[in-house]
Amino acid sequence: MKKLKILLFLCVVACTLTVQAQKQFTLNSPDGKLQTTITVGDKLTYDIHCDGRQILASSPISMTLENGEVWGEKAKLAGTSGKKVDQMIPSPFYRANELRDYYNELTLRFKKDWNVEFRAYNDGIAYRFVSRSKKPFNVVDETVDYRFPSDMVASVPYVKAGKDGDYESQYFNSFENTYTTDRLSKLNKKRLMFLPLVVDAGEGVKICITESGLENYPGLYLSAAEGEKRLTGQFAPYPKKTVQGGHN
């Protein structure tokens, strides 16, 4: 019994230290309706609330470099900064000449020359990793995991090319398909999904997952896990050899 008490005590102390080591930051949209809470601890996670209701559960993000360094795991925070942006940007290919760029931003600076920037718009939450180093580096993996609080209904476009269960064969595709609607737990785990896709969070709230500003980086695909209410990011690896294609 004495040993049990000691073990329980040690467990409680360890849990307490883990909780105390975590740091949380909250970022709100300009109108206050959207809120994301970012947690820095053993992992870097964020969630999203809309009008006080959770629409995205705590979801991890990270980036792994070729040298083995992982941005987002057991990261040491060096500082934070925030700003509010309200400006007009030109939009020559849209129905309006200008668009309002209006958001609140939180930057988390970490000790190994990298940052994570979160932005909260009135209609969305965005994030990106930023390197402060002037040296080039290679990214070998990235963790993108969307974990939802319930088994929501999603409308997704599956990749048509390639073999079932063989993601590598599905990366080369035309990005064309009709959308399939089903619950997260019933999505086809053998097929990749491309963006954009939409998850219905209920009460008139739709979550559209997409990306922007890509340069020298593979686009994001998503995959489902059977029986689970989450979507996991998949990235096409850099090809060992390229061959000129054609349609002859």
Features from the language model and the residues they span:
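N-terminal accessory beta-strand-rich subdomains and adjacent acidic, glycine-rich linkers
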Residues: 24-248
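Bacterial Sec-dependent N-terminal signal peptides
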Residues: 1-24
